[in-house]
Amino acid sequence: MKFYDAHIYYDDLRTDFNQLENLNKKYQCEFIISPQCTIQSEPEKSNLMYFLQPYLLSNKFLYYIAMVISKTFYKQNKLKFFWKIFTGFKNYHKITIPNNNDVLNIIEKYHFIKSWLWINPTEEDSLKEFESLYNHPKIVGIKLHNYWHNLGENEINIILENNKKNKPVYVILKYQNIKKILDLLRKFNNTKFIIGYGGFPHYGRIWDEINKLKNVYIDVASKHLNKKLINNIFKKFAKNKIIFSSDYPYNFQDKKKFSYQLFLKRINTNHLSNKERNDFFINNIKNIIHG
């Protein structure tokens, strides 16, 4: 099946470019990659944690408990000992400065892979890197991971103000004031935003408002979303606003390799027309990155 995956990760231990190349040769699949997020592969939570998470975050009271717990995962960008229990006691170290240059060099020979320019504006010289790579032919847009890098609105604002060509922005939210998020999306209304992970950790609390904004889209990436949440996204959002993304190569493993077949089992597209299905898998993201 042909698709255009709008968010995959480079991981030096897991990303299998032969697998991606075979998908392109067989189905003409395309991908937008993001730099590595940890030294060693990203820690994968237990299935129990993934199962409970949507229920916790959908409850207003439990949401605040989850917010407090989330602040205990890392110390000085290293996963704390207690949380290693859930990741096989591996020593994960969060990358604070995404290595865009390395990824761009790696994907240079792959015509079917583009890249997000992942910027952490809390780091010194981030704006210089932004300016030096902004016009790179492989860069389709900007990525901001509010949760991973604990970004404030002012820091995000600086990057968005320097986005002179209004390139699309892939943004993953954090536990933050919803009104402030919406204010930013409205302020930069000439920029197209893709809200990653179905709006995690806010989910339905933010859906009604972002669905009203013509410049804002939502994707279905990662195991932070279950079947019910994905079904609700298809019920809530206009079909041209839903983006196919996977978070490859994490989770959904078959013989220690990411399986798109397993990932796709969560997504019911039977209710879609042929056009809507093609738009979801291919055209919606193409329309965003190609104007």
Predicted regions and their residues:
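Short active-site segment of divalent metal-dependent hydrolases/proteases
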Residues: 10-11, 200, 250
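Short secondary-structure boundary segments
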Residues: 36, 222, 246-248
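Conserved, mostly hydrophobic/aromatic
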Residues: 7, 24, 103, 133, ...
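Glycine- and small hydrophobic-enriched segments that form the cores of compact globular domains
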Residues: 114-118, 168-169, 268, 272-273
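Catalytic pocket-lining loop regions of alpha/beta-barrel enzymes
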Residues: 140-141, 148-149, 153-244
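Mid-to-C-terminal alpha-helical segments outside catalytic/metal-binding sites
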Residues: 1-4, 15-31, 38, 239-241, ...
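Mid-domain alpha/beta scaffold segments of enzyme catalytic cores
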Residues: 1-154, 261
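Short, well-ordered coil/turn elements that cap or connect secondary structure elements
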Residues: 26-27, 108-110, 136, 188-190, ...
